[in-house]
């Protein structure tokens, strides 16, 4: 496949000896699955049509979680007038996303020990509580702001599952030639939810009019508040529907595993964490993902705040954010499908994507400094640079996830992706923390984008790829 495999020791414990005829009954734990696999010629796995329903439910949950997380950034000007939010409040509302990743390792443990169903049910229940908390009708604005912050915090706690469990779901339910596509769909829908917040918020909630007389301003404030509450109630209703559907049907795994890798023995939680932290290659590629994606996520969450000095309206900022993420989702799924057909090309795909991301982020940053660079600052240039940046960075997410799992296999997928998304949100949190103190001048925030993309490009260039899980499915099962 054009790449060197990792050490023989890393592949040694994957397949256990012996085979009983009842493979489906034996696959109730990873250890039993390993013992149930044949020592000689494993048969191909079996896939079930219900896998698409499981993927749909999980993807909808991820979509709404991203939508709820990005509720306030696109309508920050309206939220200031309706609830008296400050710039610090707006930054903190976005910051609850990465703060929710602090108990990430607990969710990773739960996913590894109790499986997909229990973890997804807990996640959706937290989202029900969070979105419900924001809808409590209270006239006291101080208490209302606290409830909104509490709701955003609970929704942030759902982030570890919707961001980490996509590769686990794809390995559990999908065959080797569908895994990257399933991972892309499940992981990209969270970003698509954040993109739709750029569209829904500004279209439903009107922007404030600072030139209105006092009485008209009070009427406008009440109208804006009513429209924001309509959005909050709608999000609460959708979350309740998804929770009910998940409670009714979301099986933890199929009766039979879809591939050899899905049935093979994995490392324990403790051994997995130790393996990840001692693997220099993994740490290298994890930083290549975490730094630019963390910076970009924080930048996207306050895009309206960043574009306000450039005299970009709330609606235009919403459309820019929407198309940048939608383009990334479409290209990401297309890239993942391409990776399913032509295997062993993940590093090359990432090099191409981050070359484009470095150029487009530099273009955007220099455009915002038009008083120095004299580059044209127009709606077209802002649209083009932001959309290209979103396409290149967002589409890299599923490719990164597949490369992580291949690099450190047999570490479980949920633990692997949990570590890297924790790192990404840590960088995002640090950036937004500084934003709460340095929010009057934001050119430093823009320069973080090309700097992080260039650093990631260099790390990917030095990375030596390997495909241990693919080796197991393609070579061992033949």
UniProtKB/Swiss-Prot annotation:
Transmembrane portions of the chain? 52-72, 90-110, 118-138, 156-176, 185-205, 230-250, 282-302, 315-335, 348-368, 385-405, 415-435, 443-463
| SUPFAM superfamilies attached to this UniProt entry | MFS general substrate transporter
Q: Does the keyword Lyase apply?
A: no
Which GO molecular function entries does the Swiss-Prot or TrEMBL record give? Answer: transmembrane transporter activity
Compartment(s) where it occurs, according to its Swiss-Prot or TrEMBL record: Lysosome membrane
Q: Which Gene3D superfamilies match?
A: MFS general substrate transporter like domains
Q: Where does this chain carry the motif Di-leucine motif?
A: 14-15
Q: Name one GO biological process term.
A: pyridoxine transport
Pfam hit, one? MFS_1
Q: Which reaction does it catalyse?
A: pyridoxine(out) + n H(+)(out) = pyridoxine(in) + n H(+)(in)
Q: Pull the Cytoplasmic topological domain ranges from the record.
A: 1-51, 111-117, 177-184, 251-281, 336-347, 406-414, 464-478
Could you name the domain of life of the organism this protein comes from?
Eukaryota
**Glycosylation site positions:** 209
UniProt keywords, alphabetically: Chromosomal rearrangement, Glycoprotein, Lysosome, Membrane, Transmembrane, Transmembrane helix, Transport
Tissue expression pattern: Ubiquitous. Expressed in proximal tubular cells of the kidney. Highly expressed in the placenta, brain and heart.
Q: Name one GO cellular component term.
A: lysosomal membrane
Q: How is it modified after translation?
A: Cleaved in lysosomes by cathepsin L between Leu-214 and Ala-261, generating a N-glycosylated N-terminal and a non-glycosylated C-terminal fragment.
* Signal peptide positions (record): none
Q: How does it sit in the membrane?
A: Multi-pass membrane protein
Residue numbers on the Lumenal membrane side: 73-89, 139-155, 206-229, 303-314, 369-384, 436-442
The role this protein plays is: Mediates H(+)-dependent pyridoxine transport.
Homology family: Belongs to the major facilitator superfamily.
Disease per record: A chromosomal aberration involving DIRC2 has been found in a family with renal carcinoma. Translocation t(2;3)(q35;q21).
Q: What is this protein called?
A: Solute carrier family 49 member 4
> What is the originating organism of this protein?
Homo sapiens (Human)
